Structure formats: C-alpha cells, structure tokens
Amino acid sequence: MPDSHPNGSASTRSSGHRLGDQVDRVAGHVREAIEEAKPHFRGWLHAATAPLAAAAGIVLVALSPNAMTRTGSAVFAVSALVLFTVSAIYHRGRWSPRVWAFLRRFDHANIFLLIAGTYTPFSLLLLEGRNRVVLLAVVWTGAILGVLFRVFWAGAPRWLYTPIYMALGWAAVFYVNDFVHGTHPAVLTLMATGGLLYTLGGLVYGFQWPNPSPRWFGFHEVFHTLTIAAFVTHYVGVSIATYSLR
C-alpha cells in the first residue's frame, strides 16, 4: 500500500540525520577537548616499546628449544606486541567517533589477552599435567569473557573492570606451591615482581593517582610505565626459564 504521508516520512528521516550529525559534532568537540587536555607523553611510551617488544619476542621464539616453548614464547610476544601497538595507535591518533570507540574497546580488551598471554609460557614451562591444563583453561576462559565484557560494555565504570583485571592476573596464587617447586627462585621472584608492578599500575589507573604532571606526564603515563616495567620483568623471567632448557 502506498505511503500516504511521504513528506512526513522524509521529514522524519531528515530530522534523524540532522540529530545524528549534531551528535557526531558534539562527540568530535568533546574528543578534541580531551586531546587538548591529554599529557604530551600520552601514548609515546607504548609506541617506543612496541618495536622493542617485537624484536625481543623474535629473539625469545628463535632461542626456544622446542615446539612447546616456542608456542608459549610466541603467544607471550604477540600478546605484548598487540597491546603496545594498539595502545600507541589509540592514544596518539585523532580518530573519528567510530574508530575511536573501536580502538578504545580493543585497547582495554588487550589487557585481558596480555594477562593470559603472560601466563601461557610460565604455565607451559613450570607446571605439569592437570595443573597446567586447568590454569591455562581458567586464564584463557577468563580472558575471553573479559574481552567480551569490555567490547560489549565499553562504558563500564573504572572501579568495576580494574579489579577484574587484577583478579585474573593473580590466578596463579592457587598454584604457588607448584610454581615454587617447579622453578628457580630468580624466575619466581621475577614472576611475583612483574605481578606486583601490574597491580601497582592497576591501582594508579583506578585511583588516577599519582598525577605528577597533567600537562606532560600524568597518572596514565605512570600506569603505562609500570606496564612496561612489568612486561620487561616477566620477559626476563620467561627467558631464564626457557634458556635453562637449552
């Protein structure tokens, strides 16, 4: 049946388009204000770390003695490289609303993937049998659920998703005795130190403090610095455990 009110329908569509354009303009102005307020170092730390992580990952995989250790090293290296790269792209670029929203989801979801990616080589190297399978299943299931959580609820409050990151990151406490008996004290110390650095970074991110220089190096840069330090610490730990098998 022909539409009896074509002009009204067209007017409604036109109004909807105008409203959408207005929303996009407002979002653009808000984003520009945020860009102006961001510290100048925002994103540069992870941008500098990404190629170094790639090179370090290639070395780790190349020097891994067997297929199992190469798999663990590759998962660890790729998860770190993706996190640092996406973070740098997200924080340094000026994006349209849709691209910005996508990168934000990707950036936050990558934290879960790095947690699981870090657990992978340590579990393969230091645990055996059922304990290895269970811990990897738990952390990867948690990571996948965490990714879905951040993708479909991008606006979740910081106080909610930050503790979830931390809880998944400390899943190893249930296997501490197995890790103690399965590795050199230096590796265990590096594992724990890296975990503490990530936790400290999570607290800085959650409380947005300390914020030493809002114009140049704010709380987010402190958070990024701690994530880099934690990654380096875990990288050294994985390297020692891997090379001891050569």
Language-model features, listed with the residues they occupy:
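Multi-pass alpha-helical transmembrane bundles in non-GPCR membrane proteins
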Residues: M1-R246
